[in-house]
């Protein structure tokens, strides 16, 4: 319930644009957000391991 209310609160606009912040589209997490994917780092990692993100693969060097 608390997480849902945070997502709804973030969806509303603030008076000042600098106060707006992005949340993960899957889990609602505010930290570790990647704008390119629109998700947090944890959801990106999970989807990449499952093969749900085309063109993304684990790096090794």
From Swiss-Prot:
GO terms for MF: rRNA binding; structural constituent of ribosome; zinc ion binding
Domain of life where this protein originates: Bacteria
Cited function: Binds 16S rRNA, required for the assembly of 30S particles and may also be responsible for determining the conformation of the 16S rRNA at the A site.
Name of the molecule in the record: Small ribosomal subunit protein uS14
Pfam families noted in UniProt: Ribosomal_S14
Oligomeric and partner information: Part of the 30S ribosomal subunit. Contacts proteins S3 and S10.
Keyword Nucleus annotated: no
UniProt cofactor note: Binds 1 zinc ion per subunit.
Keywords: Metal-binding, Ribonucleoprotein, Ribosomal protein, RNA-binding, rRNA-binding, Zinc
InterPro entries in alphabetical order: Ribosomal_uS14 (IPR001209), Ribosomal_uS14_bact (IPR023053), Ribosomal_uS14_CS (IPR018271), Ribosomal_uS14_sf (IPR043140)
Residues binding Zn(2+): 24, 27, 40, 43
GO term, biological process aspect, one: translation
Single GO cellular component term: cytoplasm
Cofactor(s) needed by this chain: Zn(2+)
Residues spanning the membrane: none
Family under the similarity heading: Belongs to the universal ribosomal protein uS14 family. Zinc-binding uS14 subfamily.
Annotated organism of origin: Deinococcus deserti (strain DSM 17065 / CIP 109153 / LMG 22923 / VCD115)
């Amino acid at each position: 319930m608390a997480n849902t209310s945070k997502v709804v609160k973030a969806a509303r606009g603030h008076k000042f644009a600098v106060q707006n912040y992005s949340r993960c589209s899957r889990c609602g997490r505010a930290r570790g957000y990647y704008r390119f994917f629109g998700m947090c780092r944890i959801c990106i990692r999970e989807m990449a391991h499952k093969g749900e993100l085309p063109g993304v693969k684990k790096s090794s060097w």
